[in-house]
């Protein structure tokens, strides 16, 4: 459903079309007025689309105000068990692109940042954690069925996706290779808590 939402811009009220699915007024107000994007659900096509929509909306507003070259930081607040790797990587790509454009995209784990939520979290310019937050990594999983050739092709795609995830982890953290190898070899969920996450270069500061 479309809603026309007034947004304050240099003392004037302007009309901005905001697409809302259900009752998202809290998320909308956080995003538009406080530059805080809340992801408090699974990583799905819908939740990623919503986050991307708000990021583009903020970029549009910055251009209208003439501050796109020196924008205020944007905060992404995470409490998610993870979800779709493919959808999550789209958001990761946009965050990285915006950082290259000069944006500061901070991430804060307010609860759980697990699986794909973990990957989104570590791409932040500055990464913060609430004291009782938790982080979790595990191997990529999928539900597959069909002919042998189809399964082989799907597995190859999965391995490529897994490598992308590994490269992101190595780029943004100090998680040792042996821990990542343990993750794959033993199919273990790897849990981290704030203090350990700081040591591993996952978290910059515990709030």
What annotation goes with each model-predicted range?
Residues 1-207:
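Terminal-region recognition feature
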């Amino acid at each position: 459903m479309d809603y026309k939402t007034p947004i304050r811009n240099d003392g004037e009220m302007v009309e901005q079309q905001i697409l809302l699915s259900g009752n998202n007024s809290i998320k909308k107000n956080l995003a538009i007025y406080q530059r805080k994007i809340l992801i408090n659900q699974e990583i799905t096509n819908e939740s990623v689309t919503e986050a991307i929509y708000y990021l583009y909306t903020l970029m549009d507003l910055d251009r209208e105000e003439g501050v796109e070259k020196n924008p205020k930081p944007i905060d992404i607040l995470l409490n998610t068990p993870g979800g779709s790797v493919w959808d999550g990587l789209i958001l990761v790509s946009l965050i990285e692109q915006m950082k290259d454009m000069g944006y500061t995209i901070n991430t804060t784990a307010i609860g759980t940042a697990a699986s794909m939520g973990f990957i989104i979290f570590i791409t932040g310019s500055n990464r913060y954690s609430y004291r009782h937050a938790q982080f979790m990594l595990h191997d990529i999983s999928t539900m597959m069925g069909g002919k042998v050739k189809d399964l082989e092709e799907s597995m190859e795609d999965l391995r490529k996706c897994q490598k992308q995830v590994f490269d992101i982890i190595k780029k943004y953290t100090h998680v040792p290779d042996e821990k990542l190898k343990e993750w794959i070899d033993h199919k273990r969920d790897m849990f981290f808590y704030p203090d350990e996450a700081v040591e591993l270069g996952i978290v910059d500061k515990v709030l």
